[in-house]
Amino acid sequence: MDVERWTPDLIPLAKRGQIEAIGVSNHNLAEIKRAGEILAEEGLKISAVQNHFSLLHCSSEKAGILDYCKENGITFCAYMVLEQGALTGHFDTDHPFPEGTGRGEAYNPHLEELAALIQELHSIGAVHQASPAQVATAWAIAKGTLPIIGVTKVRQVEEAAAAAQIVLSDEEVSRLEKLGDEAGVDTLREWEKEME
């Protein structure tokens, strides 16, 4: 990202009221801080950071981005929280993604490695009367993020909203994170970078 080039271009738009808030996506901590410095010189600030964040991809947390956002009043919007459906509990080795699709190519080779995590999402969901997708979403909320959830059905909207009411225990969060790490599945896409 060329923060030095694009950030100044946003300043006149913000000052004229043509944009209400400024956010960045797929930026590491150094880039976020530098964009913030440039904006601060003009009395502006970053309002949101949007990065890939899920039980399988936590590099924004490990890099200190989540903490930085909390400390500076920046909303962290987590995308791919459900890993394009891989963490919904709907897919496993017996029920893979359709062959020949991007999701099938990305996740089908790893469904076995994801089995323990998916089982834990089901188990925790049973305790909270929630689906695995709701548990994965509740985890992202527990980490202080605002999850971006892709939906195609009204039921999915209702389930996503209900996830905000689920309060996971520290022990549940820890179990999920341990299994996410142990799965060892790299879900980074070609347009993304590691944040660490």
Please report, for each region that a protein language model flagged, where it lies by residue.
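Beta/alpha (TIM)-barrel catalytic core signal, keyed to glycine-rich beta->alpha loops juxtaposed to Asp/Glu
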Residues: 1-196
